[in-house]
Amino acid sequence: MQSLTIPRPDDWHLHLRDGAMLQTTVPATAAVFHRAVVMPNLVPPVTTVAAAMEYRERILAEIPAGMSFNPLMALYLTADTTPAEIAEAAANEHVIGFKLYPSGATTNSAAGVKSVEALAPVLAAMQEHQVPLLVHGEVTDSDIDIFDRERVFIERHLIPITERFPQLKLVLEHITTADAVKFVENANSNVAATMTPQHLLMNRNDLLVGGIRPHNYCLPILKRRSHQQALQQAALSGNPKFFLGTDSAPHVQANKETACGCAGCYSAPAAIELYAEFFSQHNALDKLANFASVFGADFYQLPRNTETIELVQQPWTVAETVDTATGPMVPYWAGSDLQWKLRG
């Protein structure tokens, strides 16, 4: 049986939700990943260091005995965020950065920013204190096609931000387009990007052909195949600017299979195996370790993990559903096979 040992990976973009859902989401991620950047789009959003530390305690309470897991908290950037709050966040080792959500771009983003330009004083403070800006890169104008939202955001906002604040550490999250790949490649070393399993393994045909497939629906939405290929090439290139961020986003089945279904793929139960599937498909399993375990830690200037995990080539089928305290959840890739499995 073939096997692959890599340093324990980190998930640089994760949604755990709150309350009883943590009983399901925290163990699923802690079983594999040493660290995860936890997104702040709760209701109400996590906008202060104090709120983030309270949320972190709720997460820590759900880590199973014998597991080590370090949640790194992202704060929700709003029009009311102050430079003083940036300084407070910079002094807290458990805060990784601030998340920029354009208002209305994704789940629970109503409190998001309506004017990126108005953030200049806060971005200056983030640059000064070297606090990373984590970006959901989509405009939300009603006249912009949903498949163009990322490209327009880059042109309208990200290029000006990086030109004005060249020392600001910036992560363009869950990239989906060739435009995003080009932007990150052309930017300086302070700019990086996370990539999800679904955007590497699928394109919009997998969402829309043969019926609407709600469990493949996420935001930013899956794009055409040429964009998928650009993402794949970037992940396979070994460029350290591109690294793992699942954007695993749990929603109960009833909220996905409905007339107005929620956006998000719950990939945590098979996360590292999904990435292994992608790299294996491209005969590039040797690239998995850096993508999953090295590049993100290096970008955030955090120590690389010394523990290891082992994957074995052993076909298995992802469960059709995952039980939670608030109802069944359909994981990403449900009922489909993967070729690699985490040992243990």
Swiss-Prot record:
First-tier enzyme category under EC? hydrolase
- Which residues are listed for Zn(2+) 1 binding in this entry? 13, 15, 99, 247
Q: Which PROSITE patterns match?
A: DIHYDROOROTASE_1, DIHYDROOROTASE_2
Q: Which Pfam families match?
A: Amidohydro_1
Write out the catalytic residues in the record. 247
A Gene Ontology molecular function term of the record:
dihydroorotase activity
Per the annotation, how and in what number is the cofactor bound? Binds 2 Zn(2+) ions per subunit.
Reactions the enzyme catalyzes: (S)-dihydroorotate + H2O = N-carbamoyl-L-aspartate + H(+)
Please list which residues make up the signal peptide.
none
Which keywords annotate this record? Hydrolase, Metal-binding, Pyrimidine biosynthesis, Zinc
- Cite the binding residues for Zn(2+) 2: 99, 136, 174
Q: How does it assemble?
A: Homodimer.
Give the record's family classification: Belongs to the metallo-dependent hydrolases superfamily. DHOase family. Class II DHOase subfamily.
**Name of this protein:** Dihydroorotase
What organism does this protein naturally occur in? Idiomarina loihiensis (strain ATCC BAA-735 / DSM 15497 / L2-TR)
